[in-house]
Design a protein with these regions (language model features):
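Nucleotide/pyrophosphate-binding catalytic subdomain
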Residues: 1-108
Length: 108
C-alpha cells in the first residue's frame, strides 16, 4: 500500500531548550527515532522545521535571543547549518539522511 507523505512541523518550542537559546538534543533523538519508525513502515515524511535562530544563538555563544530582526537573521544564518547537522547526527543511526529544500512562492 502506497502512503501519502506526512508533513511534520517541528517548532522552536519543541526543538529548543527552554528559553530558545540552544537545541534539545534529547528531543531531536526522540523525534528522529519517530521519523525512522514511520519511514520503516513505508510512510514518507516531510519535516518543516524551525529552531535555526535557537541553534545560532548557541553557536554564537549569546546569552539570549536577539530581539531585533538583523540579530535574528544573523542567528538563523549561522544556526541553519547547525540545525541540519543535528538532523544528520540523529537520523544517521537509523540509516536515514536529511535533505534541505528551499521553497519559493511558486512552490506553494
Amino acid at each position: 500500500m502506497k502512503h501519502r507523505p506526512v508533513v511534520l512541523k517541528f517548532g522552536t518550542g519543541i526543538l529548543a531548550r527552554e528559553g530558545g537559546c540552544s537545541l534539545d538534543t534529547t528531543q531531536f533523538g526522540r523525534l528522529c527515532a519517530d521519523i525512522a519508525a514511520m519511514s520503516a513502515e513505508g510512510i514518507p515524511c516531510v519535516v518543516v522545521s524551525s529552531a535555526a535562530v535557537a541553534a545560532g544563538v548557541d553557536a554564537l555563544g549569546l546569552q539570549k535571543r536577539p530581539a531585533d530582526l538583523a540579530g535574528k537573521q544573523a542567528c538563523a544564518a549561522v544556526g541553519q547549518p547547525a540545525l541540519m547537522g543535528a538532523y544528520t547526527r540523529h537520523l544517521a543511526p537509523h540509516g536515514l539522511r536529511p535533505a534541505q529544500l528551499l521553497l519559493t512562492h511558486d512552490d506553494i
